[in-house]
Amino acid sequence: FIVSLSTVILPELSTDAKSGNWENFNKNLVFGIKVTAMISIPATVFTLLMRNEIVALLFKFGKFDDESVRLTSYALMFHISGLFFIAVTRILFPAFFAQEDTVSPTIAGIVSVIVNIVAAYLLVGSMKGGGIAFASTISAFVSTVILVFMLRRGGKINMKAVLTSFLYALKFLLISICCGVQLYFTKDFVYGA
């Protein structure tokens, strides 16, 4: 879904950047971040809580036994935690491309890859497959921070609005956690045998 959103938002951002309509550019960028939060954060919380059931439903057959479900669920837990950051980078990249800036996303991408490799190397020993997944989450977070910081450089982006959209994401996180608490205490009743 987020890839579709970023595909749709790029022409809008490009048109706004070329015409110098930075107010509309900011509005579209903030809208993209908010929609990303609205979709990815509840999906993250739900997947965190239902990861064992999801993995078992999709993969548990043949040689993929309970231990395989446990190991895959463990890695999924760390990987899905970075969904919002992965999704936000897919929205932030077009913001740079629309301004004909390919250097900033490239720098963020290179740093992100380096962070991913180093974190995976450091975490794989103690966390096994979960460490590799967590390294991806860490690198997505670092990439998001770098991209947001680099947005400030041009002076055309309303950083207050962008940062406020991240507060909007925090609100969605709190709401999702409240819903998640209910799911946590009722999932055995609802989904149990």
Feature names for model-found ranges:
Residues 1-193:
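Membrane-embedded alpha-helical bundles of multi-pass transporters/translocases
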